[in-house]
Amino acid sequence: MDEKHIENLEESLGGYKEKILEVNKGTLEWDRDLIFKVRTQMGYEIEYDANLQWGCSPTETLLTSVAGCMAIDVFYFLKKMKADIKEFRINFTGVRRPDPPQYYKSIELVLNISGTGLTTKKLDRAISLSQNKYCSVYNALRKDIEVKVSYNIKDI
């Protein structure tokens, strides 16, 4: 992939990165027990439950947010690089510290992608752009968290 193509790739991000809200707002209300309901400014709802019976934990949503943010970036970049993606899945694992604050000490993301026109060079570039420049969630993590990203390509 030449430098001109990479510049065009980054310029094309205007399609979805321009829609990012500079200020995000929402509300969180206690529902019952240790269950809280969140409503985003766009009207989406999430339930947090410390006991994990009625909703996910805040740390789970952090982990899913890292995977989701990277997925959107990588998928978008690969499409711009003319890859025809048939399947895209990220398996993720987070290992937390046992003592408070029990933040993630390591996160592993394994991208499983199948399609045509997929190369390691394209995937490495898409992941690099996401990690180093575009994934807001990834870049909001503590710097001492070890994040490992790998992938499996199935060219069909």
Language-model-detected regions and their locations in the chain:
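Extended beta-strand/beta-hairpin segments
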Residues: 1-64, 75-156
